[in-house]
């Protein structure tokens, strides 16, 4: 049985470390990936979601510049500083005004902190948000959302925009205002100032992007500051103006990331003035505050510019070399990001000179920024977050509890404890008495006794073991390795410290020379307390049969040894005080010819005494006593009774359970070794390579240690279904109680869902979903963290309570994964398969709408680049539909079917089958709207709900309609599409045929009957190109037409036979019904109506006129060869819609009991 190694495996604890440190600080932060386009957000905590009002699903994959929080009062200069901070490796603090989802404005201090990986490269950014104050929305009549409505509606015209700013914000704003004036404090010549191209255009909020080459400076009217004289008085006397700046060249668009097609960057060049006086005077807001207070500049954690290393030296620099170096660096153009979507524009390559300047800027990301992270985020000196697999952090002079040294030391202490358990009772009973009776020993001190020296060494080793235990790591309840010395000491004090301390006291040294040898012998027996730790140490071998038997035999022998020492002590204590020689020692001396003399001396040797005593205890414990050594005195008899009682218990507990122990031990180990043998045989047979073989073996060992080889499903199957549901409800209670989509569900629905959930345990590094895998399940994370990668780029980090998969209600068939899902730590996930979830929701339709509306998938794994008409997609969908056959449809009887089936557009069915959200959309003829992100379900280019893979225009099978009326009798929208709620365009054409088949009980007619599943309302429709070419080959179309022809021939044959049967039944009833009839009715009471043929009553409703639709439908086989095929891809269609026969017969058909719609 392998030792559990779960707590020592390397884990990526980056996210857990950040969350654990921020729990008690009420932090609000997001984590962005620096290697993807726009530095997309890959994680946001609950505090940030509460701050901005957005959910985690809405924030994921957005640019970390938080442009979705921008509004009319958001300073473009502050947004430019955040964007510039994303280029470098230095931490930066920016004060900016943001807007919540409900439209309320707040002033926020943003900390942009880079995070490096094991190679030292910055791959992530942590943005911490701290609310400075809530801004007063002066003149704002209503709180609109920050992404809707024109910006001019926020403030009344003619009123000043005033902010109540704190002093740090005012100073920072003054610095930004001063930097816009030539030669002012903090001008562009300062190396620490943020230099961007500015103009005086008003700040207009952008919906998707922030163009930093159009950043404007805030004027006095927007900032709400006093006159310029008050600002100068606040800062102090500034340096004289240095003249007007040089004209700025027109900015050119460049790209810093050739791989990211979704974004581009622009470079803005600014020539700074060579004004050293302004640089020495002040270069940042911190220096201004220091000048104002008359104190030296405070120590700073952050840099407000890109030239932070030069700042401290330039304030006091007097040499020409320093000034020349500053002038050279100040000529480097500043770099700003431009998050503008330029997907349609070609890639613009930057000149060679610009590349040489950009390269050092990008290389700054490889600086060591870990200390900055800990200082800014207050993580503590012992926590350095790095996104990598981290081994447990161990303090200096700390010993790992699983290290080889600790293992060897434990075995050494174990041997010393066994020595103590054997020799301490023997020394106390035999040797001390022998020393008293023997001749006087020479005066050579303590070293003349060999056992005393060994005892002294044992005492020293026990004391050293106590010191080592104070520096040995342990595993806490969370399976974390604790290496902090203080926590280790507290844990040891609460555990084994008292027992170890008592066992390590050197009583021989403390009472040496006092003459009380008997007292020393009794006190030394306290070392036997260490046997408790030995039992715990040997408990890990309790599943090995041979080890258990050996330990039991050793325990039996040790108890016999202790009892032998006590048996000798009793006889030796009574021997000098007995007048009659009846003790067992006197009998032993007489038997071996070594009797005791009158003075009590002489007698058998120590060897004879010990062997005889051990012989007696063994024979008494095993109840085999021969009687040659027998108790004679009362004390000996009482002790013998006690030995017999102990022997009976020992004999019953040990030897009586030997067979049971062997069976139990070999049952567990046999299962483990059998399964391991199968795994190794599988590896050998298939020639698995070594890396994959190691992963297989490690996963098997970890899974065995986690479940102990118990199949939970097999255990549950042994209980009744009601008890299984209760157990599953208990196992999934945390998910069902705290996950929002499951709130409001009935007890029966929760029990049904709990039965379908499966728990998955994944170790670090295990890949749960590979790119391109079929998404057949929905995953809910209950513990641990995972990462989602596209190639080698991390696109998302998900933690507890996150959901990933695909929105099952939007697609009729499962899609493919667009990335790899890999575990960072030990994870527990709940997953439910697609078919199981849809089956439960069909059984509870009243809960289905609430579930789909409240379900927020944190990351959508569906690949949006799939081509709907690609080869093999039809076979995939057909196989999926055949696999998922739901024969029962739990639909409310109050739900009415649409009156007419509708018509499929010739340009594609996406216009009519997009659901209610696709009607009345003013965005264009297709109702399109810009997508919010690459992972949103609206931006999918795959087939949507209700969409078929090939365009089709179906010839109607009903009576002609007026010219201006569309098929189905429903009005058209502005762009000509029909506003129909139905999702089945062919249901009307085949409704008559399906009702006939359901009446005659054709089981094959119910095989593919499913309710049309309409999608939930979505913000935007899928964009379908007008010229969508048919991707199916001509042979496939002809094959499908031939199959339809054969099916119709079979149906025609069956219909003819059924009609003949109907006619025969009608002829038999000619004498029982009136001559003039149009339908068979139940005859009235009379002498001739002896019986009523109930099964025949609905038959005459199927007249030949009502079957004319079948003949029209069979004429479909004569369509020209180039006619388009019938749609095979799309949502499952319900073929039996009784509302479609209204135009064919005045009397409604009687619905058969097996019809799903009944």
From Swiss-Prot:
It comes from the Eukaryota. InterPro entries: cNMP-bd_dom, cNMP-bd_dom_sf, Ion_trans_dom, K_chnl_volt-dep_EAG/ELK/ERG, K_chnl_volt-dep_ERG, KCNH_animal-type, PAC, PAS. SUPFAM superfamilies: cAMP-binding domain-like, PYP-like sensor domain (PAS domain), Voltage-gated potassium channels. Keywords: Cell membrane, Coiled coil, Glycoprotein, Ion channel, Ion transport, Membrane, Methylation, Phosphoprotein, Potassium, Potassium channel, Potassium transport, Transmembrane, Transmembrane helix, Transport, Voltage-gated channel. Residues 258-269 have a biased composition (Polar residues). The modification Phosphoserine is found at residues 239, 283-284, 319, 350, 870, 873, 1136. Residues 17-88 form the PAS domain. Pfam families: cNMP_binding (PF00027), Ion_trans (PF00520), PAS_9 (PF13426). A motif (Selectivity filter) lies at residues 623-628. Residues 424-449, 516-519, 568-610, 632-637 are extracellular. Glycans are attached at residue 597. Residues 611-631 dip into the membrane without crossing it. Belongs to the potassium channel family. H (Eag) (TC 1.A.1.20) subfamily. Kv11.1/KCNH2 sub-subfamily. The potassium channel is probably composed of a homo- or heterotetrameric complex of pore-forming alpha subunits that can associate with modulating beta subunits. Interacts with DNAJB12 and DNAJB14; chaperones DNAJB12 and DNAJB14 promote tetramerization. Heteromultimer with KCNH6/ERG2 and KCNH7/ERG3. Interacts with ALG10B. Forms a stable complex with KCNE1 or KCNE2, and that this heteromultimerization regulates Inward rectifier potassium channel activity. Interacts with CANX. The core-glycosylated, but not the fully glycosylated form interacts with RNF207. The S4-S5 linker acts as a signal integrator where it both couples voltage-sensor domain (VSD) movement to pore opening and closure, as well as providing a binding site for other domains that regulate activation and/or deactivation of the channel. This is Voltage-gated inwardly rectifying potassium channel KCNH2. The lineage of its organism: Eukaryota, Metazoa, Chordata, Craniata, Vertebrata.
């Amino acid at each position: 049985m392998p030792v559990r190694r779960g707590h020592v495996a390397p884990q990526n604890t980056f996210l857990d470390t950040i969350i654990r440190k921020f729990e008690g600080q009420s932090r609000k932060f997001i984590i962005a990936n620096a290697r993807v386009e726009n530095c997309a957000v890959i994680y946001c905590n609950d505090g940030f979601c509460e701050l901005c009002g957005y959910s985690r699903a809405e924030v994921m994959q957005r640019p970390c510049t938080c442009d979705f929080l921008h509004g009319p009062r958001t300073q473009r200069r502050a947004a430019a500083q955040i964007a510039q901070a994303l280029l470098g490796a230095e931490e930066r603090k920016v004060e900016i005004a943001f807007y919540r989802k409900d439209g309320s404005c707040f002033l926020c201090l943003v900390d942009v902190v880079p995070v490096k990986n094991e190679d030292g490269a910055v791959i992530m950014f942590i943005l911490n948000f701290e609310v400075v104050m809530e801004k007063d929305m002066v003149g704002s009549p209503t709180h609109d959302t920050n992404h809707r409505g024109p910006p001019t509606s926020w403030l009344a015209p003619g009123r000043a925009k005033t902010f109540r700013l704190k002093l740090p914000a005012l100073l920072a704003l003054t610095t930004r205002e001063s930097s816009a004036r030539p030669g002012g404090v903090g001008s562009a010549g300062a190396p620490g100032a943020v230099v961007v191209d500015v103009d005086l255009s008003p700040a207009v909020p952008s919906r998707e992007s922030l163009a930093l080459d159009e950043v404007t400076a805030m004027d006095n009217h927007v900032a709400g500051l006093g006159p310029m004289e008050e600002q100068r008085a606040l800062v102090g006397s500034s340096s004289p103006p240095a003249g007007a700046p040089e004209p700025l060249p027109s900015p050119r668009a460049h790209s810093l990331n050739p791989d990211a097609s979704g974004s581009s960057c622009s470079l803005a060049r600014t020539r700074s003035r060579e004004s050293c006086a302004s640089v020495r005077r002040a270069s940042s807001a911190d220096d201004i505050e220091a000048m104002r207070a008359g104190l030296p500049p405070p120590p700073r954690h952050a840099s407000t510019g890109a030239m932070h290393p030069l700042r401290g030296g330039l304030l006091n620099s007097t040499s020409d070399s320093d000034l020349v170096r500053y002038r050279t660096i100040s000529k480097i153009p500043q770099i700003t990001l431009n998050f503008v979507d330029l997907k349609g524009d070609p890639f613009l390559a930057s000149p060679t000179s610009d590349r040489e300047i950009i390269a050092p800027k990008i290389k700054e990301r490889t600086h060591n920024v870990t200390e900055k992270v800990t200082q800014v985020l207050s993580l503590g000196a012992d926590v350095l977050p790095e996104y990598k697999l981290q081994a447990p952090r161990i303090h200096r002079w700390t010993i790992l509890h699983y290290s080889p040294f600790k293992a060897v030391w434990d075995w050494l202490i174990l041997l010393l404890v066994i020595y103590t358990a054997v020799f301490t009772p023997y020394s106390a009973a035999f040797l001390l008495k022998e020393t008293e009776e023997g001749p006087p020993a020479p005066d050579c001190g303590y070293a003349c006794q060999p056992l005393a020296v060994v005892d002294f060494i044992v005492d020293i080793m026990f004391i050293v073991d106590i010191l080592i235990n104070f520096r040995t790591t342990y595993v806490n309840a969370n399976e974390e390795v604790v290496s902090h010395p203080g926590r280790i000491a507290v844990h040891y004090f609460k555990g084994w410290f008292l027992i170890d301390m008592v066992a390590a006291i050197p009583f021989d040294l403390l009472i040496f020379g006092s003459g009380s040898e008997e007292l020393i012998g009794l006190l030394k027996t306290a070392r036997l307390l260490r046997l408790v730790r030995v039992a715990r140490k040997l408990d890990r071998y309790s599943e090995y049969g041979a080890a258990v038997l050996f330990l039991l035999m050793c325990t039996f022998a040790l108890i016999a040894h202790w009892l032998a020492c006590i048996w000798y002590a009793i006889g030796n204590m009574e021997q000098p005080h007995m007048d009659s020689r009846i003790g067992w020692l006197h009998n032993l001396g007489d038997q071996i010819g070594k009797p005791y003399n009158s003075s009590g001396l002489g007698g058998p040797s120590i060897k004879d005494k010990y062997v005889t005593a051990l012989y007696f205890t063994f024979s008494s414990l095993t109840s085999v006593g021969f009687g040659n050594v027998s108790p004679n005195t009362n004390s000996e008899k009482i002790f013998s009774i006690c030995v017999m009682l102990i022997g009976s218990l020992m004999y019953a507990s040990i030897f009586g359970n030997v067979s049971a122990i062997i069976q139990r031990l070999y049952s567990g180990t046999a299962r483990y070794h059998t399964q391991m043998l199968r795994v190794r045989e599988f590896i050998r047979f298939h020639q698995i390579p070594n890396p994959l073989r190691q992963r297989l073996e490690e996963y098997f060992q970890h899974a065995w240690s986690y479940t102990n080889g118990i199949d939970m499903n097999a255990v549950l199957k042994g209980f009744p279904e009601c008890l299984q549901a209760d157990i599953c409800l208990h196992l999934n209670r945390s998910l069902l109680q705290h996950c929002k989509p499951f709130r409001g569900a009935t007890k029966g629905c929760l029990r049904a869902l709990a039965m379908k959930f499966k728990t998955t345990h994944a170790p670090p590094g295990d890949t749960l979903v590979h790119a391109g895998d079929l998404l057949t399940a929905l995953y809910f994370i209950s513990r641990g963290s995972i990462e989602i990668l596209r190639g080698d780029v991390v696109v998302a980090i998900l933690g507890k309570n996150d959901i990933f998969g695909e929105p099952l209600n939007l697609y009729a068939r499962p899609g493919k994964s667009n990335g790899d899902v890999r575990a960072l730590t030990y994870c527990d996930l709940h997953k439910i398969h697609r078919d199981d979830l849809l089956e439960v929701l069909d059984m509870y339709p009243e809960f289905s709408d609430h579930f789909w509306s409240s379900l927020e998938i944190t990351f959508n794994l569906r690949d949006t680049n799939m081509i709907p008409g690609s080869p093999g997609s039809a076979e995939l969908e057909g196989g999926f539909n055949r696999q998922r056959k739901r024969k029962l449809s739990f639909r409310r009887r109050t739900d009415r079917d649409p009156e007419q089936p509708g018509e499929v557009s010739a340009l594609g069915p996406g216009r009519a089958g997009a659901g209610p959200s696709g009607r009345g959309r003013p965005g264009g003829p297709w109702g399109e709207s810009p997508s919010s992100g690459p992972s949103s379900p609206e931006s999918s280019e795959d087939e949507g709900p209700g969409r078929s893979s090939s365009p089709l225009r179906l010839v109607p099978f009903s009576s002609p309609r007026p010219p201006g009326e569309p098929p189905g009798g429903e009005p058209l929208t502005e762009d000509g599409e029909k506003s129909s709620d139905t999702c089945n365009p062919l249901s009307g054409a085949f409704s008559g045929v399906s009702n006939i088949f359901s009446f005659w009980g054709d089981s094959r007619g119910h095989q593919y009957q499913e309710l049309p599943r309409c999608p939930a309302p979505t913000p935007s429709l899928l964009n379908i190109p007008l010229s969508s070419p048919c991707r199916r080959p001509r042979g496939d179309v002809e094959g499908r037409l031939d199959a339809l022809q054969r099916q119709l021939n079979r149906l025609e044959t069956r219909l003819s036979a059924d009609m003949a049967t109907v006619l025969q039944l009608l002829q038999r009833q000619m004498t029982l019904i009136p001559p003039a009839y149009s339908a068979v009715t139940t005859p009235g009471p009379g002498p001739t109506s002896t019986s009523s043929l109930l099964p025949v009553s609905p038959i005459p409703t199927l007249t030949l006129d009502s079957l004319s639709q079948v003949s029209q439908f069979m004429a479909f086989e004569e369509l020209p060869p180039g006619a388009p095929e019938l749609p095979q891809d799309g949502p499952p269609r319900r073929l039996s819609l009784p509302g479609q026969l209204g135009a064919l017969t005045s009397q409604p058909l009687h619905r058969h009991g097996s019809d799903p719609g009944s």
